[in-house]
Amino acid sequence: MFGRTLNTFTSRNAPLVRNFDKFIVNNTLTSKNIYLSQTNTTNTPLSYSTQAKKPFTITEKRIDELKTPYQPTSPHLTIYKFPLPAVMSIMHRATGICLALGITGLAGVTLFAPHDAIHYIQLLHTQYPALVYPAKFAVALPLTYHFCTGVRHIIWDETVKGLSISQIESSGKVLLAVVAVLSTIFTFVSFK
C-alpha cells in the first residue's frame, strides 16, 4: 500500500467511472448528455469538465440603477453615536488645524497686505461693530479649547493618572465647562 504512486490510485479508480453510462451536465444555458464509455479506452483518469455552448455573461448595471431611493449607504456615520472622548479628540485636532490656518492667514496679511493687521482690526471695529464679539468668540473658543485639551494631555502623559474611561469622560465634561467660561471671558474682556 505504501509503495503505490498517485498514478496507481488514479488508474485503479478509472474503471469505476467507466461503469456509468452517461451523466447530464446542466447549467442555465444548456442541458446535454455526455457519454463517457465511448471516448476513454486508456487507463487515464476521465475529465468531468465540459464547455457550454454560450459563455456565461455578467449583467452590468449603472450605479444609479442599483441605489434604492431614500436609503443611506451602509455603514453611514449618522447611525453611530460617538463617545465624548472621541468627539473631543477629533475637535482637538480640528481646532489645531483651524488655529494653524488662522496664524498662517494672519502672517500672510501682515506680509503681503498694504496695511498691517491692526489696521484691519480697527476697520472691523468701525465698519462692522456687530461682528466684533462674534469674531472675538471665533478666535477665543478654538484657542482656549486647544490649550485646555493640550494641558490635559500633558497631565496624562506626565502623571499617568485619570486614564480610565469614567475619569476621561468626567474630566472632559469639566474641561468643556472651563472652556465655555474662559472663551466667554476672553470674548467680552477688552485688552488695551
Curated annotation (Swiss-Prot):
Residues 1-27 form a transit peptide. Keywords: Electron transport, Heme, Iron, Membrane, Metal-binding, Mitochondrion, Mitochondrion inner membrane, Transit peptide, Transmembrane, Transmembrane helix, Transport, Tricarboxylic acid cycle. It is found in: Mitochondrion inner membrane. The heme b is bound between the two transmembrane cytochrome b560 subunits. Heme b binds at residue 146. Residues 48-83, 157-164 are mitochondrial matrix. GO terms for biological process: mitochondrial electron transport, succinate to ubiquinone; tricarboxylic acid cycle. Pathway: Carbohydrate metabolism; tricarboxylic acid cycle. The keyword Metal-binding applies. GO terms for cellular component: mitochondrial inner membrane; respiratory chain complex II (succinate dehydrogenase). Pfam families: Sdh_cyt. Residues 114-131, 187-189 are mitochondrial intermembrane. It is a multi-pass membrane protein. GO terms for molecular function: electron transfer activity; heme binding; metal ion binding. NCBIfam families: succ_dehyd_cytB. Component of complex II composed of four subunits: the flavoprotein (FP) sdha, iron-sulfur protein (IP) sdhb, and a cytochrome b560 composed of sdhc and sdhd. Membrane-anchoring subunit of succinate dehydrogenase (SDH) that is involved in complex II of the mitochondrial electron transport chain and is responsible for transferring electrons from succinate to ubiquinone (coenzyme Q). Belongs to the cytochrome b560 family. This is Succinate dehydrogenase cytochrome b560 subunit, mitochondrial.
